[in-house]
């Protein structure tokens, strides 16, 4: 069976809403990781994140790496919300894997959460689990800024 590595940065992560879609596709968890410092992250209506590559203006984003059977990759992509796609993601060690990325239009008028460092940290800050000053820089943003 052929497989590929897939970096996920939102609701596909372990224990979150869409993780059963990864499991149903036959995926197995490999490790927690981070991107290179060239991505920005937005909260899309507080339902899921969108990560965009922004060379020279980004930060590291926490994510998980999963091994996914090629036959299940389309199933995972089809279960993602509109505006998210599979593309190449640069990891902090310089390696490149497939990953879930957002399209710029999706981020217009949405809250930028890059300073949180990842979706889990944003969700925790929003719930007050990390104190009132967590992710202070959260603000509406533009994908082309």
Region spans (language model):
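Glycine-aromatic micro-motifs
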Residues: 1-145
